[in-house]
């Protein structure tokens, strides 16, 4: 089957949607926005050489080689997938080099300005090699599809893989991304490195984060101050369980200037400067706890803005509001909104 994406035309054994599966070079159509954003990120940051560490069909590396000025290496451990990538590189007249070896072995032979980690499942086994294989002040792009562990929906996986406790509730996807970044930060610190999150996205079945990697134990020490525990009971009493979750990343999820430029160029609508705030107020949770109906979310956001507060929707919940106001005030304004719309 022939698939066209961006400037590439590749041969694939099958087209797949969803979290992916093991197999020779399957093409995941749901990851197109992931690849679009990656290409715009590479352009924006002026990256000159790239390792696509998990080649699959070769679509990511081929698109990068054709749509940016970067030199590209594609690595793939599967011999069958390697042959498929090599054929697709030739089909596209791409200058990408293709290596039939493991991700870790490729990184032992040289460092890259940008390393892309997009494996089947969890990125955890590959993070140390990736962090060590990035050049000074280089970049990592990491995809995680192991949401059952990151969101706490399978608690023993969360404990074993990420050494953390996460409650599977309304906040699970924000906590999942913060757990992923926090784990990356811990691994970086252990290697004398530190990271700065530049873009963080939840898109369906996967999380995608881009970070800058720097060296130095002093910087690592400062970075580790962003790790800690979250107790949602403090958001709004009487709704959320009194328990400490984490450790997770409590710092910024993105560099607003980088995220805005990259996501706009990629045609992605998710940029929101308020996403850096830790957690949000969820109107569905409040309505359920107070046994009332759900108001129009935009009316509550308008009321917050009129009160002088920053407020916006969040990618993590269709009824969540990121704001500098307390959730107590959000609840009060929500009730006012409901009363105003009620018939006299």
Curated annotation (Swiss-Prot):
EC class: transferase
Secretion signal, residue range per the UniProt entry: none
Known catalytic reactions: guanosine(26) in tRNA + 2 S-adenosyl-L-methionine = N(2)-dimethylguanosine(26) in tRNA + 2 S-adenosyl-L-homocysteine + 2 H(+)
Keyword Nuclease: no
GO biological process: tRNA N2-guanine methylation
UniProt superkingdom: Archaea
A GO term, aspect molecular function: tRNA (guanine(26)-N2)-dimethyltransferase activity
Alphabetically ordered keywords of this record: Methyltransferase, RNA-binding, S-adenosyl-L-methionine, Transferase, tRNA processing, tRNA-binding
Trm1 methyltransferase domain mapped to chain residues: 1-334
Sites where the protein binds S-adenosyl-L-methionine: 35, 60, 76
Enzyme Commission number(s): 2.1.1.216
Function per UniProt: Dimethylates a single guanine residue at position 26 of a number of tRNAs using S-adenosyl-L-methionine as donor of the methyl groups.
PANTHER family per UniProt: N 2 ,N 2 -DIMETHYLGUANOSINE TRNA METHYLTRANSFERASE, TRNA (GUANINE(26)-N(2))-DIMETHYLTRANSFERASE
Family: Belongs to the class I-like SAM-binding methyltransferase superfamily. Trm1 family.
HAMAP family: tRNA_dimethyltr_TRM1 (MF_00290)
Name of the protein described by the UniProt record: tRNA (guanine(26)-N(2))-dimethyltransferase
Organism: Thermoplasma acidophilum (strain ATCC 25905 / DSM 1728 / JCM 9062 / NBRC 15155 / AMRC-C165)
């Amino acid at each position: 089957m022939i698939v066209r994406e961006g400037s590439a035309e590749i041969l694939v054994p099958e087209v797949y949607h969803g979290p992916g599966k093991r197999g020779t070079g399957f093409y995941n159509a749901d990851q197109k926005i992931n690849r679009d954003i990656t290409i715009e990120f590479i352009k924006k940051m002026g990256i000159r050489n790239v390792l696509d560490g998990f080649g699959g069909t070769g679509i990511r590396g081929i698109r990068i080689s054709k749509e940016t000025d970067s030199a590209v290496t594609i690595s793939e451990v599967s011999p069958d997938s390697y042959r498929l990538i090599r054929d697709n590189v030739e089909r596209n007249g791409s200058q990408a080099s293709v290596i039939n070896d493991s991700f870790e072995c490729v990184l032992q032979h040289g460092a890259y300005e940008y390393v892309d980690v997009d494996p089947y499942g969890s990125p955890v086994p590959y993070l140390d090699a990736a962090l060590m294989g990035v050049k000074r002040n280089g970049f990592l792009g990491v995809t995680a599809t192991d949401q059952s562990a990151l969101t706490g929906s399978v608690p023993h996986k969360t404990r074993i893989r990420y050494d953390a406790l996460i409650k599977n509730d309304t906040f699970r996807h924000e906590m999942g991304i913060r757990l992923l970044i926090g784990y990356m930060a811990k691994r970086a610190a252990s290697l004398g490195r530190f990271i700065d999150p530049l873009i963080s996205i939840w898109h369906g079945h996967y999380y995608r984060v881009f970070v800058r990697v720097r060296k130095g134990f002093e910087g690592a020490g400062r970075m580790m101050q962003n790790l800690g525990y979250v107790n949602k009971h403090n958001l709004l009493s009487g709704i959320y369980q009194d328990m400490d979750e984490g450790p997770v990343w409590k710092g910024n999820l993105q560099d607003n200037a980088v995220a805005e430029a990259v996501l706009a160029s990629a045609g992605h609508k998710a940029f929101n400067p308020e996403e850096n705030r830790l957690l949000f107020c969820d109107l569905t949770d409040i309505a359920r706890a107070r046994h009332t109906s759900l108001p129009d979310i935009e009316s509550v956001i308008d009321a917050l803005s009129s009160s002088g507060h920053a407020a916006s929707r969040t990618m993590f919940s269709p009824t969540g509001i990121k704001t500098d106001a307390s959730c107590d005030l959000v609840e009060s304004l929500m009730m006012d909104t409901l009363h105003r719309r009620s018939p006299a």
